[in-house]
């Protein structure tokens, strides 16, 4: 019994020490929401947080460990990867120790946040460690990391740290409020672009698209011959698609020869590498096959 008690005490002490070390670089982010979120001091004077928690672009404040409140400014936000970057005066606040190493399923992890200056922690495991995936908004995320732990909204944007003591990802709430994590390698890439330009490059088609099934259900469109494609429901007057000759009511059925079934597939194809490329669109126009070449533009800043 004594050995068991000593082992548990040692585990408890090491866990608390790991949280304490990590929490030195974790802040609370106040941006007009119902409650604050958390953020990671990623580089000197640079805080990373979850893009979805920012209710406004101005009047952002940070609560540092210990409770001191400071002003922060938005450097950029990328909803496609759920990464936002803030600038502030660190005044000696340590930068988080990070790693690009991918976690494994079963790894024991800690989610560390900041609640009004106090440390916030949740213990769990990596439930699923998968490969690259695309978010619903088209962002490329290097690893799919699903967590088996209780993540509160206040902890969203905080650090996911492994037994080695390094921050491997940022914790966020995914669909159905399941805890997932954005890996450090994805964050690094987003931070570089957001600091340089305030946004992450994304391709721009300049066309509003909708699944043809929705139109069929209302009797609006006959669809393509084989049932594939997405319907063009709006066009940017100055956008690439309008300039190339795309028309309202066209059905996009293929992208460089690859069949298109869902709007989400088009979003995935409009990644940073697509800007400036010429794409061959397969179409159904008035019930007949057609084709069009479109030079992909850069998504304008809203």
Regions found by a protein language model. Give the residues of each.
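C-terminal cap/linker of serine protease catalytic domains
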Residues: 1-19, 111, 163, 167-225, ...
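Conserved active-site neighborhood of the chymotrypsin/trypsin-like protease fold
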Residues: 2-7, 31-120, 144-145, 153-154, ...
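Active-site region of chymotrypsin-like
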Residues: 23-25, 84, 88-97, 120-177, ...
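A cytosolic small-molecule/anion-sensing beta-strand core signal
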Residues: 42-43, 162-163, 256, 285
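Gly/Ser-enriched beta-turn/beta-hairpin loop segments
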Residues: 75-82, 129-145, 193-201, 212-229
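Short, well-structured beta-strand-loop connectors
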Residues: 103-108, 161-167, 247-254
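PDZ/PDZ-like domain segments forming the peptide/carboxylate-binding groove
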Residues: 149-159, 210-254, 258-261
């Amino acid at each position: 019994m004594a050995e068991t008690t000593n082992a548990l005490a040692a585990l408890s002490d090491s866990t608390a020490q790991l949280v304490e070390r990590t929490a030195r670089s974790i802040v609370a982010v106040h941006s007009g929401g119902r409650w604050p979120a958390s953020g990671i001091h990623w580089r000197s004077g640079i805080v990373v947080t979850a893009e979805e928690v920012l209710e406004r672009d101005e009047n952002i404040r940070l609560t540092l460990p210990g409770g001191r409140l400071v002003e922060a400014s938005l450097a950029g936000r990328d909803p496609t990867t759920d990464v936002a970057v803030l600038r502030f005066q660190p005044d000696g606040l340590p930068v988080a120790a990070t790693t690009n190493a991918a976690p494994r399923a079963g790894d024991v992890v800690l989610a560390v946040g900041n609640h009004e200056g106090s440390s916030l922690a949740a213990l769990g495991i990596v439930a699923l460690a998968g490969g690259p995936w695309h978010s619903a908004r088209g962002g490329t995320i290097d690893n799919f990391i699903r967590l088996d732990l209780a993540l509160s909204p206040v902890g969203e944007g905080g650090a996911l740290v492994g037994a080695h003591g390094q921050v491997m990802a940022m914790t966020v709430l995914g669909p159905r409020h399941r805890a997932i994590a954005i890996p450090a390698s994805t964050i690094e890439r987003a931070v570089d672009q957001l600091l340089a330009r305030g946004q992450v490059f994304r391709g721009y088609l300049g066309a509003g698209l909708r699944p043809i099934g929705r139109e069929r259900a209302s009797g609006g469109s006959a669809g393509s011959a084989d049932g594939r494609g997405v319907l063009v429901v709006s066009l940017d007057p100055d956008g690439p698609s309008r300039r190339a000759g795309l028309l309202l009511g066209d059905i996009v059925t293929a992208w460089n020869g690859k069949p298109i079934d869902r709007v989400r597939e088009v979003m995935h194809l409009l990644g940073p590498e697509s800007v400036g490329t010429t794409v061959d669109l397969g179409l159904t126009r008035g019930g007949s096959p057609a084709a069009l070449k479109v030079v992909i533009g850069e998504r304008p800043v809203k």
